[in-house]
Amino acid sequence: MKMVKFVKIIYKRIPFMKIDLHGIKHENVSRHLDVFFWEMMQKGVSQVEVITGISNRMKEIVKETCKDYNFEVIENKINIGSVFVKLN
């Protein structure tokens, strides 16, 4: 008879490097993201969280900026006030 081992997997929330755009004017968001993305890529970070709040315009600016870099934007299913960005 074969012995089957059961392994308990504990899922931990992996902390993401993040930027909080609260308080940043829409016209300055792209520049803040440019600097943040550059710093994260220099550190070898592959995915970040961008906190946008519930502003649809802020999310659109983030998506437009990410499109310029061909970065993938992933909606956060748990927190609608942020998105994840995969850095290439």
Specify the residue positions occupied by each region the protein language model found:
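Long, charged, low-complexity intrinsically disordered regions
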Residues: 1-88
